[in-house]
């Protein structure tokens, strides 16, 4: 299809108002610019008319806020949704639709928008029009829309194209650098440019014809490396930017010839076995599509393969020769055009054309990757839960390439390939011993469950792809091979971490009987989901983005949040990128997903906070029962491989595995593993405590860790549900503290403001918990900032708060543009029937009426309080515990943030240290290794007080300016040498010196 011309801005003035005018502009956009037929126009107009009132309300929030740009955004959203969600009745309609269809890239070109900006603005359209799309296209509209998958695919292709361009530039010279060329090829200025384009088009053909529908980043990178091998073999050697004699880059076989594939694997961190398999597929694509005759590489006589081991290499006659290159490009272009008729909203050739006006140039995240490759600032603080590093992490290999998202993914895949893949696909002997030590042998149950759950996550048959009308046997076979490989990787990782957890539990409890842990259905599903998610994150799979593992295993975000910390803790070799992925995942769970409708957290909350039950039930937030293994197997249309039917679980009260009761759909447990090292400091627990959170978290007996949520805890005087909710709330407050601190630093606010905002957030979580229901915690944080600013008479507008929030690495525009409200209970004036409003309206009409009494209590002493808004005596009593008066100068209510880098600590703040409690020190350091450590509070010398140690350290740090001209090995107390002294001595050695120091002797103090 020919590229469409941009819309004429003079057709209808965008500043004109009125329904008729905007409808006319939309009609012209569809019919005049996109040449839509009448049926498609009618359907598009129907969706436009039903959502028009939402556009009129939110137009100023789209893009830069100009009327014309806002209209174009809305037009693009409407047409994209309509095209993706329209159901074709039969194959004839589908074929006709494909012939006359338009693609997303064509919509954006007409609207003069780019992909990056489109994907950034799309989420708020989805949030606001969700009910309309559900009514028109069914409840599964979001799954069929595949917006997140399309965005991830765009990000992956952006990264891959940059990766390919960088590698091509490294390997081959630009044609104008070839000054010695005598042939027609050398005289062609466009030859290398055409070869570059040929490589990308061949890669796209490989994606279409040879790869499975699971086009993950690792597989695609292997494909690109195979393309580079094809180019090296066939592009004349004079265009190379390297020499085969360079031993630092190439692996030589028998110290004579270069092993090309092994060398490329060494350069680009790919698996040699996988690369050789991919080379076979690439050669088949060249042979079948370009109709080239393959021959043994040893038969090549043009000198291209001199000094290269030709074993297992294929050479194609006249491939990449000047006389045939143009026709080969035409064939690949035609092949891709045919593929675009069947699937795809994105013309992937755009990435090689450098069409920045259509692609966009700013950053965009997709899945677990960011196009810019920059590390999020929040990662420097990691998760709200503590992460323990290990000497084995991160897993690195000596790479000569600069670090990019693609190279990082390949390094992570190498960990999976070298550490996990060699393991057994069955429980180890040690793990089997734990499984057999339960009240009954659960080995077969564990194996059977793992097979069913992983088959559900990685189905052999594959989930039907609406954009693919037919699949060949080859594609189905590749799908099954890919799924089987991922299942095995996840299974081996699951068994490995499960054994580490069992070993740790047995050491704590001094016994191998772990029945409560190993018979808990929800625990195992969470572990399997976590293992599968790490495998998916390693391969960067576009079609299976989080939370796919939650949906396919039948667990909720609240369930998964309980095992993430333990998983990280007990897999010491986990690469840094995967640790970061799990930490980022935990942030997503805590900030919003746990608060969504259907979260099992609400089932626990009804028991832990009975006063919230009515609101939870009224909003319909409770999670449904966790589906049985039989139901999961049936839903995936797969066989259990001859396994016996899964027995029905006992739903009687008090059973550890009960999952049927809606009130107790989540087995609320707190494993010793999760709690043992979390929030154990009494000071932190007092500052982070919510409601009746105890000042010290004790390790519960394993028998009660997985008991019914309503069962009383044996040592804490509270139910297991209360214990789980309190731990969850403590993580929420720690995450909020990190984000509040980031906003305070960005806006340069005082410590008093920071503490008041933090204190207010704590009180809302403990006393106005319902404000978090169906919302994002950042929405509450932003409102807390403005509320505190008003009560303290600080000159800070909501616009300034949002402006600074947009600069935060975790910012999402829909956070302040679409806040959930329930019109059935609110008394909003002029309500529009929306389920989501902007944050200022939420603040004025929902937040303030609920929080005003708490705000009044936070007012400074010089600000008079309104007696009508005094908090009840009960609330005052509750507040005095976890959140002391912010004016108190003795103890700050703001907690110490986790894993802070020394560079993150402001120089204007004093840093204090306190002695390490002997009980904690003994737990961390064994008797035999104490001599290797120096603990604050314990002297490093016999009969010497710790204060003298600190004094000595301070003297050394403060005395660095007193340096010596030469090192004196006879004295013990030798000062440190400054950088300036070293620099000066180097000048003197070179016979050069600053004028001020020329001829002067170095002083020794």
Swiss-Prot record:
Spans annotated as Domain A: 404-605
Gene3D superfamilies: 1.10.472.140, Cyclin-like
InterPro entries from the UniProt entry: Cyclin-like_sf, RB_A, RB_B, RB_fam, RB_N
Segments for region (Domain B): 723-853
Compartments where located: Nucleus
Main subcellular location: nucleus
Entry's Gene Ontology cellular component terms: chromatin; nucleus; transcription regulator complex
UniProt-recorded Gene Ontology molecular function terms: RNA polymerase II transcription regulatory region sequence-specific DNA binding
Biased composition (Polar residues): 863-873
Domain of life: Eukaryota
Region (Disordered): 863-899
Location of region: Spacer: 606-722
Keywords: Cell cycle, Nucleus, Repressor, Transcription, Transcription regulation
Region ranges (Pocket): 404-853
Pfam families (alphabetical): DUF3452, RB_A, RB_B
Gene Ontology biological-process annotations: cell differentiation; negative regulation of G1/S transition of mitotic cell cycle; regulation of transcription by RNA polymerase II
Family indicated by similarity: Belongs to the retinoblastoma protein (RB) family.
Task performed by this protein: Regulator of biological processes that recruits a histone deacetylase to control gene transcription. May play a role in the entry into mitosis, negatively regulating the cell proliferation. Formation of stable complexes with geminiviridae replication-associated proteins may create a cellular environment which favors viral DNA replication.
Protein name as catalogued: Retinoblastoma-related protein
């Amino acid at each position: 299809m020919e590229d469409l011309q941009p819309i004429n801005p003079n057709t209808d003035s965008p500043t004109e108002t009125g329904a008729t005018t905007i409808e006319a502009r939309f009609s012209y956009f569809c019919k005049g610019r996109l040449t839509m037929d009448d049926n498609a126009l009618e359907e598009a107009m129907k969706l436009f008319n039903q959502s028009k009132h939402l556009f009129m309300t939110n137009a100023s929030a789209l893009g830069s806020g100009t009327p014309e740009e806002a209209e174009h955004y809305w037009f693009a959203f409407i047409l994209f949704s309509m095209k993706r969600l329209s159901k074709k009745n039969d194959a004839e309609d589908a074929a006709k639709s494909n012939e006359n269809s338009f693609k997303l890239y064509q919509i954006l070109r007409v609207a003069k928008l780019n992909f990056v900006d489109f994907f950034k603005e799309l989420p708020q359209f989805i949030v606001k029009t969700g009910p309309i799309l559900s009514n028109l296209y069914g409840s599964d509209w979001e799954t069929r829309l595949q917006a997140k998958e399309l965005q991830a695919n765009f990000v992956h292709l952006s990264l891959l194209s940059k990766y390919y361009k960088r590698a091509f530039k490294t390997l081959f010279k630009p044609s104008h650098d070839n000054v010695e060329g005598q042939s027609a090829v050398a005289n062609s200025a466009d030859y290398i440019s055409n070869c570059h384009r040929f490589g990308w088009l061949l890669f796209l053909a490989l994606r279409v014809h040879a790869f499975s529908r699971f086009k993950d980043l690792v597989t695609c990178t292997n494909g690109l490396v195979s393309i580079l091998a094809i180019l090296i073999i066939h592009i004349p050697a004079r265009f190379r930017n390297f020499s085969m004699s360079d031993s630092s880059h190439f692996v030589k076989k028998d110290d004579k010839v270069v092993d090309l594939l092994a060398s490329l694997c060494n350069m680009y961190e790919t698996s040699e076995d996988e690369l050789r398999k991919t080379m076979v597929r690439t050669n088949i694509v060249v042979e079948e599509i370009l109709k080239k005759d393959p021959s043994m590489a040893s038969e090549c006589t043009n000198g291209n393969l001199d000094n290269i081991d030709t074993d297992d290499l294929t050479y194609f006659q006249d491939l990449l020769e000047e006389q045939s290159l143009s026709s080969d490009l035409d064939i690949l272009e035609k092949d891709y055009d045919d593929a675009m008729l069947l699937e795809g909203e994105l013309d992937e050739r755009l990435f090689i054309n450098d069409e920045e006006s259509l692609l966009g140039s700013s950053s965009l995240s997709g899945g677990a990757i960011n196009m810019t490759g920059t590390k999020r600032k929040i990662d420097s603080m990691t998760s709200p839960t503590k992460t323990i590093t290990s000497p084995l992490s991160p897993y690195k290999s000596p790479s000569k390439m600069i670090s990019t998202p693609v190279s990082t993914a390949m390094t992570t895949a190498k960990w999976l390939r070298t550490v996990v893949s060699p393991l057994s696909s069955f429980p180890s002997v040690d793990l089997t011993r734990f499984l057999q030590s339960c009240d009954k042998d659960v080995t077969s149950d564990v194996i059977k469950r793992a097979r069913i759950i992983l088959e559900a996550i990685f189905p052999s048959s594959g989930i039907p792809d609406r954009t693919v009308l037919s699949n060949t046997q080859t594609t189905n076979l590749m799908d099954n091979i890919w799924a089987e490989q991922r299942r095995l990787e996840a299974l081996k990782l699951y068994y490995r971490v499960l054994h580490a957890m069992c070993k740790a539990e047995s050491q704590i409890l001094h016994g191998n009987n772990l029945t409560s842990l190993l018979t808990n259905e929800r625990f195992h599903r969470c572990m399997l989901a976590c293992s599968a998610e790490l495998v998916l994150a390693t391969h960067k799979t576009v079609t299976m983005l989080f939370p796919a593992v939650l949906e396919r295993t039948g667990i909720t975000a609240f369930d998964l949040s309980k095992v993430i910390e333990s998983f990280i803790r007990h897999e010491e070799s986990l690469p840094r990128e995967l640790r970061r992925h799990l930490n980022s995942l935990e942030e997503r769970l805590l900030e919003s997903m746990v608060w969504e409708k259907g979260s099992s957290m609400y089932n626990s909350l009804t028991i832990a906070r009975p006063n919230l039950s009515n609101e939870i039930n009224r909003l319909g937030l409770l999670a449904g029962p966790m589906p049985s293994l039989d139901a999961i197997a049936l839903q995936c249309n797969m066989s259990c491989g001859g396994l016996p039917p899964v027995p029905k679980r006992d739903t009687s009260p008090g059973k550890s595995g009960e999952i049927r009761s809606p009130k107790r759909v989540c087995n609320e447990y707190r494993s010793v593993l999760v709690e043992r090292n979390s929030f154990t400091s009494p000071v932190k627990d007092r500052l982070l405590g919510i409601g009746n959170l105890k000042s010290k978290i004790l390790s519960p007996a394993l028998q009660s860790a997985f008991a019914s949520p309503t069962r009383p805890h044996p040592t804490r005087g509270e139910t297991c549900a209360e214990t789980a909710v309190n731990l969850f709330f403590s993580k929420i407050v720690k995450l909020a503290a990190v984000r509040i601190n980031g906003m305070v630093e960005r806006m340069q606010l005082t410590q008093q403001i920071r503490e008041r905002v933090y204190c207010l957030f704590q009180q809302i979580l403990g006393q106005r918990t319902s404000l978090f229901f169906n919302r994002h915690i950042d929405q509450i944080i932003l409102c807390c900032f403005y509320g505190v600013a008003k009560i303290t008479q600080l000159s800070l507008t909501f616009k300034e708060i949002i402006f600074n929030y947009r600069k935060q690495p975790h910012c999402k525009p829909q956070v302040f543009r679409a806040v959930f409200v329930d019109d059935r209970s609110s008394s909003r004036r002029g309500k529009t029937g929306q389920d989501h409003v902007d944050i200022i309206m939420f603040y004025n009409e929902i937040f303030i009426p609920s929080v005003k009494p708490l705000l009044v209590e936070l007012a400074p002493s010089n600000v008079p309080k309104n007696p009508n808004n005094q908090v009840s005596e009960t609330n005052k009593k509750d507040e005095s515990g976890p959140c002391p008066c912010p004016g108190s100068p003795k103890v700050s209510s703001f907690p110490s943030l986790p894993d802070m880098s020394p560079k993150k600590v402001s120089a204007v703040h004093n840093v204090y240290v306190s002695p390490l409690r002997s009980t904690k020190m003994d737990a961390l350091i064994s008797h035999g290794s104490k001599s290797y450590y120096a603990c604050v509070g314990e002297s490093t010398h016999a009969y010497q007080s710790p204060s003298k140690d600190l004094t000595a350290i301070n003297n050394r740090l403060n005395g660095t300016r007193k340096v010596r001209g030469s090192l004196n090995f006879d004295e013990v107390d030798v000062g440190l040498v400054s950088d300036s002294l070293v620099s000066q001595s180097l000048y003197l050695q070179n016979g050069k010196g600053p004028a001020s120091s020329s001829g002067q002797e170095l002083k020794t103090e």
